[in-house]
Amino acid sequence: MTIYLIRHGKTEANEKRLYCGSTDLPLSEKGREELSQIHYDIKNVRFLTSGMKRTDETLKILFGGVPFDTDPRFREVDFGTFEMHSYEQLKDTPEYQAWITGDNEVNIPPGGESGEQMRKRVLDAFDEIKEDTVLICHGGVIAAIMAHLFPEENKTRYDWQPKNGCGYRLDLCSSQLKCSNRTSASNEWWTKRLRFVPIFASRRTS
């Protein structure tokens, strides 16, 4: 079984470096333009999104009008009252300091959810995937999955976050999970684990 984890394209919040999890933003113009330059040659799979505007729109740009399913458990973490605010706007508030200086895997932002709460719902949903699937979701969601699957890498969830429009390919074969990461800079998948065959994406020509 092969699972592709692809992060949605850029939004206005990404460009302005704002906390954006539960806020249902569409892609920005720049995000749409960047995605229009990417082509993934992936066929005969199930397509799945988190159901948020930015993931649904990303899927339609990358794969056209393919039928797809949605699962809200793959939504980004809810930052509560920190949503749509920047670090500079929040850094001096006691609520933000209590969250950012502690264990924010456990700490809950006001009106939001902790990283651990998000991780549990995401992994519950991920465990239900039983066929070749393209999952268009969010940076924090992908990072939570990768950190869970590859603890031996000693990476934080933040280290695992891919760039917008990029992601990972996971192959589950003979009970062994292998992984590769696609970067838009090189426009290819680079090998992350032993004996993994890289796949190459091409630039969209029309």
Role assignments for model-derived ranges:
Residues 49-50, 120, 136-137:
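Short beta-strand scaffold positions
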Residues 11, 141-142:
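Short active-site segment of divalent metal-dependent hydrolases/proteases
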Residues 3-4, 45, 128-140:
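Generic beta-sheet signal
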Residues 62-121:
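Phosphate-handling substructures
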Residues 26, 66-73, 153-162:
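Short hydrophobic/aromatic-enriched beta-strand-loop microsegments
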Residues 2-69:
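Active-site-proximal alpha-helix that buttresses catalytic centers in soluble enzyme cores
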Residues 42-73, 98, 150, 171-206:
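Conserved histidine-centered catalytic loops in small-molecule metabolism enzymes
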Residues 152-178:
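Domain-level recognition of soluble alpha/beta enzyme cores
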